[in-house]
């Protein structure tokens, strides 16, 4: 087996974890009229250097990831409270180079990622409203929670490290709060992502990962024309990886970014987003930019 598989395999795992647990997503706890459907298609580009922990013999990893996703969401009534159910199907193409055990290698891989399902409920300040009732609704203080699940159905080959899927479940409970102040909305959220064991890792190894804890903040400015812009930041820590009992380093990273949503028609809008690594203890420094319709 070529050593170059290691660089791509662990890198894809990093990308999948980032997508699931380090999202910079503003307006996650905004209300919507019951029955409203959302269909979103998007593309993202990630590029940068990745620093792996001591459990993995990889150095000088430089990666480029092209990712696409298709997402569907529906606003629902949860015992009189506003809520949403969301389904995301990702696909990724990754290419990169790295030194594995001192040998310079390169790798290309592509495939479907693990699909994700998320259910959210607004416990306070977000009642379930019809389309007509929603016309008179004004957001103030909203408190909500969500539960996200990553389902291990993505591309995975146990004979190789280069996989898009992770071959393990991930569960992410989150608590969020938002406060509207005139044209501004401030949103805060904290979460923990828990992982099951991958007992079919490359070479018959067992891969475990500690919970990953995250906190994110958004300052969102709304205009009367439907356009909105946000400044985003997230801090996450934990997520230590252990392979066959050999622990790596605990992660501690900060990312900052911005989002701009531009209405095109009454029912369509374009969202532009980007983020950079501000502080990276492990996981590397990489930049991400994308567009969604």
For the regions a protein language model found, what residue spans apply to each?
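Outer-membrane beta-barrel biogenesis signature
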Residues: 15-40, 48, 125-141
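Transmembrane beta-strands of outer-membrane beta-barrel proteins
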Residues: 37-39, 83-87, 117, 141-147, ...
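Residue-level signature of outer-membrane beta-barrel architecture
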Residues: 43-45, 74-76, 121-123, 149, ...
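Surface-exposed strand-loop-strand hairpins of Gram-negative outer-membrane beta-barrel proteins
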Residues: 46-67, 104-105, 158-165
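Repeated loop/turn-to-beta-strand initiation elements of outer-membrane beta-barrel proteins
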Residues: 49-50, 80-83, 127, 183-186, ...
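Outer-membrane pore/translocation modules
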Residues: 92-209, 247-249
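Outer membrane beta-barrel transmembrane domains
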Residues: 202-293
């Amino acid at each position: 087996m070529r050593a170059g598989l290691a660089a791509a395999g662990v890198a894809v795992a990093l990308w999948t974890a980032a997508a699931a647990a380090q999202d910079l997503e503003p307006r996650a706890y905004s209300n919507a009229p019951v029955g409203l459907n959302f269909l979103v298609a998007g593309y993202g580009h990630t590029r940068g250097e990745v620093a792996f922990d001591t459990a993995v013999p990889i150095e000088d990893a430089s990666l480029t990831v092209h990712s696409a996703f298709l997402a569907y969401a529906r606003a629902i009534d949860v015992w009189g409270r506003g809520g949403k159910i969301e389904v995301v199907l990702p696909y990724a193409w990754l290419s990169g180079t790295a030194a594995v055990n001192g040998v310079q290698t390169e790798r290309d891989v592509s495939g479907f990622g693990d699909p994700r399902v998320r259910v959210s409920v607004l416990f306070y300040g977000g009642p379930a409203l019809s389309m007509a009732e929603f016309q008179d609704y004004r957001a103030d203080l909203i408190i909500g929670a969500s539960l996200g699940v990553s389902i291990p159905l993505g591309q995975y080959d146990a004979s190789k490290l280069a996989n898009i899927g992770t071959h393990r479940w991930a569960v992410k409970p989150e608590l969020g709060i938002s406060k509207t102040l005139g044209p501004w909305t401030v949103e805060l959220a904290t979460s923990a992502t828990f992982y099951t064991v991958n007992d079919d890792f490359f070479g018959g190894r067992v891969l475990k990962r500690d919970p990953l804890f995250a906190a994110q903040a958004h300052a969102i400015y709304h205009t009367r024309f439907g356009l909105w812009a946000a400044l985003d930041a997230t801090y996450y820590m934990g997520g230590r990886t252990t392979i066959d009992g050999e622990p790596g380093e605990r992660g501690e990273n900060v990312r900052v970014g911005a989002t701009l949503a531009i209405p095109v028609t009454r029912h369509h809008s374009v969202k532009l987003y980007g983020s950079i690594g501000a502080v990276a203890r492990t996981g590397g420094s990489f930049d991400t930019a994308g567009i969604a319709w």
